[in-house]
Amino acid sequence: MAKKGSGYGPRGGDFRYNDEAVARLINAIMLDGKKVVATKIVYDAFDIIANKVEGGDALEVFRKAMGNVAPLVEVRSKRVGGATYQIPMEVPASRRTALAFRWIKQFAARRGGRSMAEKLAAELLDASNEQGASVKKRDEVHRMAEANKAFAHFRF
């Protein structure tokens, strides 16, 4: 008989904030296994945010930005009798955060000419204020789901 696996336990947080979401953001920013570089980018971005925000709480801005970017619904393709329908589906919590990290990283990298830490800080600040490209992406995904609401009865 197979041994019972340990399953998924709680992940460790990051060093400075001891927060699991910040650790996941660092992992999302990381390229080619260079975690020290990714950690420096994220912490520098948080320092920039702390200097720009009155209360100085970068973690609160980050959490608000994540909440504003994470999508509630998305469309999934399903083939029904020769036609492909875009079916709106609720997004599971783990995918919501993964999409939010992905979009924040993607649209921060597209911003013009400064360091990645400055671009990430600008994107997080914009996202916390319901602005920026990552929030537009979330709104676009929600609009697609709203437009295809008629096909919701085809759920998987």
UniProtKB/Swiss-Prot annotation:
CDD domains: uS7_Bacteria (cd14869). GO terms for molecular function: rRNA binding; structural constituent of ribosome; tRNA binding. SUPFAM superfamilies: Ribosomal protein S7. It comes from the Bacteria. Keywords: Ribonucleoprotein, Ribosomal protein, RNA-binding, rRNA-binding, tRNA-binding. GO terms for biological process: translation. InterPro entries: Ribosomal_uS7 (IPR000235), Ribosomal_uS7_bac/org-type (IPR005717), Ribosomal_uS7_dom (IPR023798), Ribosomal_uS7_dom_sf (IPR036823). GO terms for cellular component: small ribosomal subunit. The keyword Lipoprotein does not apply. It holds the Pfam family Ribosomal_S7. The keyword Zinc does not apply. Part of the 30S ribosomal subunit. Contacts proteins S9 and S11. One of the primary rRNA binding proteins, it binds directly to 16S rRNA where it nucleates assembly of the head domain of the 30S subunit. Is located at the subunit interface close to the decoding center, probably blocks exit of the E-site tRNA. PANTHER family: RIBOSOMAL PROTEIN S7. Belongs to the universal ribosomal protein uS7 family. This is Small ribosomal subunit protein uS7. It comes from Chlorobaculum tepidum (strain ATCC 49652 / DSM 12025 / NBRC 103806 / TLS) (Chlorobium tepidum).
